[in-house]
């Protein structure tokens, strides 16, 4: 899993303790085993992106206090995940007709996905998506770490930060507890 390699590298570079990665991997396998009532698409997303990060947070909590664990997760989410996603978006933004293509694909995905429930408004100049149920939030709550969901939301802000062809803002989120 790509996510596991990123986590292992982060632990090696930042924390210098591979025991954390071994525990994270154990926790991840346990969480995956206990995940129920999800579609195959949800399971794939959970296993590839969401649950490895939740397992890392839980493993960190075994080695550090909760505030320190959260700070380490914040660094991982912002500097590894968010930064890489933002870099990819800035590269894609150079593609001619980027906004047109991206908005069409994004809106199509939002209509058919089972990763979240949303309402979408759009025209040629903008699209507005209101997500009313979110797999990331549900996974954090189901795994007893709702505070971690805020970092998933923050990564969206980082992903779209500084883009010239897409403006992005979050007004309310389940992760911030104001939706």
Regions found by a protein language model. Give the residues of each.
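Short, hydrophobic/π-rich interface segment
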Residues: 119-177
